[in-house]
Amino acid sequence: MRRLIVISGAGFSAESGVRTFRTDESTGKALWDEYDLEEVCNIHAFRGNFYHKTHMFYNKRRAELPTVHPNLAHLRVAEWFQRYPGQVVNLTTNVDDLLERAGVPKEDTLYIHGYLKEIVVETEAGSPKQIIDVGYSEVNPDDYGWCKPNVIFFGELAPAYGKMYDILDTLTKEDMVIVVGCSNTVINFNWELFPAVKRGTKVLVVNPRINYLEQEQYDAHGVLQFRCGAVEAFSNNNFIKIVEDHLEGKTALQSKG
């Protein structure tokens, strides 16, 4: 059976208005508004002096979610998911719920770095951890013995990586992969996908900021590149035809070894 694997990153949701992290040019630090990510996205800081500040940060991010909406790219992926049952697989490094709101059930998406609407709760030291869906509500950490946003922090193990690698290891010539809006900074999907290309997997990259080195590597491997945002690519008739021809068993594109 032909499969489509969609790997999405921050650029997939950016056009919906979901803010992304930026790098401060003067300090080189990664920031989200006034927050230093080393303080609010680091497991060691969370366990130290930044427990409450981290929850304030994620409360703001959670409150932002209902103010943004799925864009055309989310809706297109959801349309394919519904039109081609069992053929479309979603892997995302995003923690928002826009794919779910577009029509892809949460359980049918692998959230590689967690899910913003959930918290992990421990009622007392050593007790089993529970995952609670808090929706868009503000969390008061003092209401729990211990709690943490169900989001993977720097310095923390990511349980979903194992399942992600299992999926990528199964790629064959029957598969097509779209990598959309991924910076390849935390996870370099190029190194995971180039071996699959040699096995015949077709790969499309959607990224307006492909650098020269990446372009050389993509060209050498026969990776088709769309140098634009997610919305533009997923509304491009040629792009849509390539994907749908693949899913329907027609000739799509050839990969080089």
Residue ranges, per PLM feature:
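Conserved catalytic core of sirtuin-type NAD+-dependent deacylases
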Residues: M1-G257
